[in-house]
C-alpha cells in the first residue's frame, strides 16, 4: 500500500502547530510569573485564577515548563530523517539530553499532579496516569536504543512524544471552555487533560504506524 506525501506531511504539520502552541504557552506563563503586573491581564483575565495557582508554585512550574518546551523542540528535530542522516553524532548526543530532560518533565508532572491540583481528583488522575505512561515510554525507548533496536526505540519515543504534545492540545480545549463559561476551571480542567492527552497519545501511535508504512513503501520503490 502506497502512502502519499500529503498523507505523511499532514500529521507532522499538526504536530508542528501543537509545538508552536506549547512554546507560546510556556512563553506566556514565564512572562506572567516574572512580571505579573504587566502580563497577567488583571482581574478581567478569565484565567486569573489559574495564573494565581501557578504563581503559588512558581519554582515547580519553571522546573516543569522550561524543560518541557526544550523536550518538544528537541524531539521534533530528532524525528527529522534528514537531520539524523546528516548529523548522526549530534543526534545521539541530543538524544541523551532529551532523555534527561524528559525525566525532569515527567517527574515534575507527577509532583504537580498533587501539589497544584486545579481540576480536582479528575485532573490528578489524568496527569498522574499520563506522567507515568510518559516515563515508561521514555525509559523503554532508552533501553531499546541501548540494545541497538532502533525501530523499537523510535516507536516508544513517538509514544512519549505523543504524551508530551497532550499539554499543547489541552490549550485550545481550555480556551473553548473559557469561551463558553459554563464550567469553572475546577470543573473542566480535568476533562481538558483527559481529552488532550488521550487524543495525542492515540495519534502518536497512529503516526508511528504511518511512518513505518511510509518507510517500507520508500524501500520498495528504490
Give the label of every model feature segment.
Residues 1-222:
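Alpha-helical membrane insertion/targeting regions
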Amino acid at each position: 500500500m502506497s502512502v502519499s506525501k500529503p498523507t505523511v506531511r499532514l500529521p507532522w504539520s499538526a504536530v508542528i502547530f501543537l509545538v508552536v502552541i506549547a512554546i507560546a504557552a510556556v512563553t506566556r506563563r514565564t512572562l506572567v510569573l516574572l512580571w505579573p503586573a504587566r502580563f497577567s491581564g488583571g482581574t478581567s483575565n478569565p484565567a486569573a485564577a489559574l495564573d494565581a495557582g501557578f504563581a503559588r508554585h512558581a519554582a515547580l512550574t519553571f522546573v516543569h515548563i522550561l524543560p518541557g518546551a526544550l523536550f518538544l523542540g528537541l524531539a521534533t528535530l530528532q524525528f527529522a530523517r534528514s537531520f539524523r542522516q546528516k548529523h548522526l553524532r549530534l543526534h545521539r548526543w541530543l538524544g541523551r539530553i532529551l532523555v534527561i530532560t524528559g525525566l525532569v518533565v515527567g517527574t515534575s508532572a507527577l509532583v504537580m499532579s498533587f501539589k497544584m491540583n486545579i481540576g480536582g481528583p479528575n485532573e490528578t488522575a489524568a496527569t498522574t496516569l499520563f506522567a507515568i505512561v510518559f516515563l515508561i515510554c521514555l525509559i523503554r525507548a532508552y533501553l531499546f536504543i541501548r540494545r541497538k533496536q532502533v525501530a523499537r526505540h523510535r516507536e516508544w519515543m513517538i509514544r512519549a512524544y505523543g504524551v508530551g504534545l497532550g499539554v499543547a492540545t489541552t490549550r485550545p480545549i481550555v480556551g473553548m471552555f473559557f469561551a463558553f463559561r459554563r464550567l469553572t476551571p475546577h470543573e473542566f480542567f480535568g476533562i481538558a487533560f483527559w481529552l488532550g492527552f488521550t487524543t495525542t497519545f492515540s495519534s502518536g501511535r497512529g503516526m508511528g504506524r504511518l511512518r513505518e508504512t511510509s518507510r517500507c513503501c520508500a524501500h520498495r520503490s528504490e
